[in-house]
Amino acid sequence: MFDLQGRSTLLRYGTSKTQPMTEPTLETILLVEDEPAVRNLFAQALKRAGYSVYEARNGQEAMKLFDQHGESIDMLLTDMRMPYMGGAELAHHLRGRRRNLKLLCISGYPGNLDAELAIDFLAKPFSRDDLLKKVREVLDK
């Protein structure tokens, strides 16, 4: 289980019922998370499930990656609270450039969501299976 409490991060990686895929899905996710250990766990889970993943520490890095690889990115998976540029601001920028970009926001603070973006949300803490299920659900919309 990914368990995050307050500003300090407690991480537990539990067992999963989801088996790794044998072939990549060919879908690409731009993962934006400022906590390195959390970003690494999420990226590993997504890659093991067959997704291609670009990783960014903050919104500014994500914008640069989107400039370089935007055509191949299927989903933005972003933390909402980050330094320099939060997830909502980043989502606004990227949706302004590509209206059909799939969005999934993760946060321990669900009160900060922007209804105008019509984004999907996953509240921390959550399990690996919860993450993979929600990612698949959003990509399939």
Where are these regions (language model features)?
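C-terminal output helix
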Residues: 43, 126-139
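Charged docking surfaces used in two-component/phosphorelay signaling
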Residues: 40-48
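Conserved acidic carboxylate
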Residues: 33
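Receiver (REC) domain active-site loop signature in two-component systems and cognate sites
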Residues: 82
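Acidic catalytic/metal-coordinating carboxylates
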Residues: 58-61, 85-90
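Acidic, metal-coordinating helix/loop segments flanking the phosphotransfer/catalytic sites
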Residues: 30, 43, 55-75
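Active-site residues of response regulator receiver
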Residues: 79
